C-alpha cells in the first residue's frame, strides 16, 4: 500500500513519485492551498494539496480531519525557500498530493496526539493505543526494541541458546505470592504463573545446555507499591562451569556494548565492586547511587559515653547505630527546610533529625549552631568534625536508632539532598554489590529468610556457618546497580543436593515440604549437576533508566496501574458462573460486588 515511510523522505527522493500511508497529525488551510502533516511510525511529512494541480484530491483534502487514516500518492519536491523546517527530519521537502484515499475516519480523540500537553495517566492508559501514537511514547517502544535486539545479539554471538521455559508451573513457598491458575482437568489443583524461570534454567544446566538465555515474562502478586508491575519482563541468563567473576566480567562486556551501540555512551570497565556491608555503612542501602558525593560516617563509638540518651543508647545497643551525614554548603538551610527533612526521614521510621551547623570551625563549640551541642563534650565534637571532614558553611545531620532505621532514613535523605542541591553528577555509574548475607532474620516470623532466594550458594569458606552461625554466612550473590537502581541480580547456585536440603531446613522448609515442592530439583542435583550460576535483568527498569523516563509504566506497551488493574480492558473482572462451576470453584462475593 505504500512505497516509503513518511519520516524517511529527504532531498534524495526529489522528483520521485511516492505512496504514503499514515494518520493526519494536523490539517491547515492557507490561502486556497491545504497542508496536511501526515504521520507514521518513522515521523512526519508535509503534504500539499493544490486545486490547480489536482482538483479531486483537493476536494477530498477539504473533508479530512485529525487522526483520519490516509493513503496519499504524490511527488516529492523542495519546500519553497524560507518555509523549511530545521526541527523536522523531513523539513527540507514536501509531497505534492496527486491522489488521496480515505482509509478510515476517526472520532475526536480523548486527547490531542500532536500537542505536548500534560494528560492524566489514567486516561492515557485507558486509551493507550492513542497514547502510543504520540512520538515520545512510540520512541520509547522503538528504544525498548533496540535494547532487546542488541542484548540478544550479544548473547547469540557468545554461544547462549534462547530457550523457552514453562508458564504454567508449580507454586512454591518462597518469595512473593504466586498468581494461581486453576486446573479444569485436575479439580481442586492449581498451576502458578512463574515469578522467574529460576528452577527450569537450573535444570537446563543439569541437562548440559551450558549457556541459556530468555527474554521472559514473570508474574508476582506483590503488595501494591509505586512503580511495580504484577507482570514484567526479564532478561534471564544462566551458564555452567564458571565463577562469579567470569560471569560479572561477561555482563560488563554486554552492558558496555549495549550502551555504546544504543546510547553511543562509553561505560568504563571493570565496574566497581562493593561489599554489601560497605554499601550499608557508607550509603545506607544496598543500591547506592555513586553519582552523589555524600557518604554516611559512623560516629557511634564517639557517642557511647555522652550524656545524651538519644545518641548513647543506640551507640551501646548491639543492633543500634549512630551515623552522620555531611551536606557541603548546607549551613544556609532554614529552620523550615530542616523541618521538612525531619518529616521526610520520619517516613522511614526516624524519630527525629539532629544536626550541627558549622559556621566557623576554628572556634570550636563557639563556631557551631545546634540544639544538641550542650549534650556533647568538646572532644566528641572535635572528633566528629574531624571524621566527617566538616568545613565552614556545612551542616551535619545525625541518625541514631536501630541500624536498619538509621540506614534506611539517612540513605534516603542522602539521595534527596543530592537531588535537591544539584549534587548528582551526570553520566552513568554502574557497580556490583557483592558479599551479601545468605539469610536475614525475620522478627515477626522468628525464622530465617533467604536474602536473595533459597537456591543461592553460600561461599565455600562459609559452609560451616550454615549450622554454626547462619547470620554470618555470606552468599555468592551479586547485584548490578545503575545510578542507584538495581537492574539485575544473580548468584552462583547450589549444585549439591545435600547442601540444598540443608538450606531448605534452615529456612523452615521441612524435608516433606521440600520433596513436595522441590523434589524434582533435589533429584536433578543428584545426577551430575555442574557448577553453574546466572543473573536476571529487569528489562522494563533498564529501559526506563536508559530513556530517562519518569515511570516504569512509560516503557511497557500496556502496563497495569499501581492497583494492578488494566484501565484499557477492565481487567481483572468477574467471570461467568458456568466457567467457575467447570473449574470447581466457588466465589464468595462481597456485598459491594456487582452481580
From Swiss-Prot:
Its main location: cytoplasm. One of its GO terms (cellular component) is cytoplasm. Residues 198-201 are annotated as: Aspartate. Signal peptide: none annotated. Coiled coil: none annotated. L-aspartate binds at residues 174, 220, 452, 493. It is found in: Cytoplasm. InterPro entries: Aa-tRNA-synt_II, aa-tRNA-synth_II, aa-tRNA-synth_II/BPL/LPL, Asp-tRNA-ligase_1, Asp-tRNA-ligase_1_N, Asp/Asn-tRNA-synth_IIb, AspRS_core, GAD-like_sf. GO terms for molecular function: aspartate-tRNA ligase activity; aspartate-tRNA(Asn) ligase activity; ATP binding; nucleic acid binding. The record marks 30, 82 as: Important for tRNA non-discrimination. GO terms for biological process: aspartyl-tRNA aminoacylation. It catalyses: tRNA(Asx) + L-aspartate + ATP = L-aspartyl-tRNA(Asx) + AMP + diphosphate. Keywords: Aminoacyl-tRNA synthetase, ATP-binding, Cytoplasm, Ligase, Nucleotide-binding, Protein biosynthesis. It comes from the Bacteria. The keyword Nucleotide-binding applies. It is an enzyme of class 6 (ligase). Its EC number is 6.1.1.23. Aspartyl-tRNA synthetase with relaxed tRNA specificity since it is able to aspartylate not only its cognate tRNA(Asp) but also tRNA(Asn). Reaction proceeds in two steps: L-aspartate is first activated by ATP to form Asp-AMP and then transferred to the acceptor end of tRNA(Asp/Asn). PANTHER family: ASPARTATE--TRNA LIGASE, MITOCHONDRIAL (PTHR22594:SF5), ASPARTYL/LYSYL-TRNA SYNTHETASE (PTHR22594). Homodimer. This is Aspartate--tRNA(Asp/Asn) ligase. It comes from Nitrosococcus oceani (strain ATCC 19707 / BCRC 17464 / JCM 30415 / NCIMB 11848 / C-107). The lineage of its organism: Bacteria, Pseudomonadati, Pseudomonadota, Gammaproteobacteria, Chromatiales. The gene is aspS.
